[in-house]
Amino acid sequence: KVIDLLASRYDATVRFNGGNNAGHTVKNGDKTLHFSLIPSAALHEQKILISQAVAINPEVLLNEIAMLKKLGVEVDLGIDPRCHVVVPYHQALDGASEASKGKAKTGSLGLGIGFTFEDRTNRAGIRMEDLVQPKVLEEKLRQNWTLKKKRVTEAYGQNFNLVLKDVKIGRAHV
């Protein structure tokens, strides 16, 4: 709320880090919006930027953009191509990890954010720039898929029900 107030004085606002596990509510006049990826100054119709330290779930981002457009807000969004992408296997890992802890659960939301950042740290993640390079994307998915499936089933003892050919990133099938 404070950021939204301050943002009206600047040309751009940046979402610096995190993922869609951290949301914020913006009230501007009669409009109340809930964002988790889009920077809070979006209603000011200024440049909004997402830095490389943000884990992006493309479906969530597309829904937030659609919400703004439905309200007639012009979206001037810049995304660092090095942003890492939340892939369905990150969510599978998150759920399996949480389920394997029994009574010692941490209360994860199951959104896969932590596992996306783990891939970022290990230099194994899929980045936004990979989404426009089909061969690179496919190769990275195949490399990661086997490892993630093995981890879910063997390390966490959970079922891995995802099928690679059925993976959607955003609204596009891979």
Describe the function of each predicted region.
Residues 1-171:
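Non-transmembrane, aqueous-exposed alpha-helical and coiled segments at domain scale
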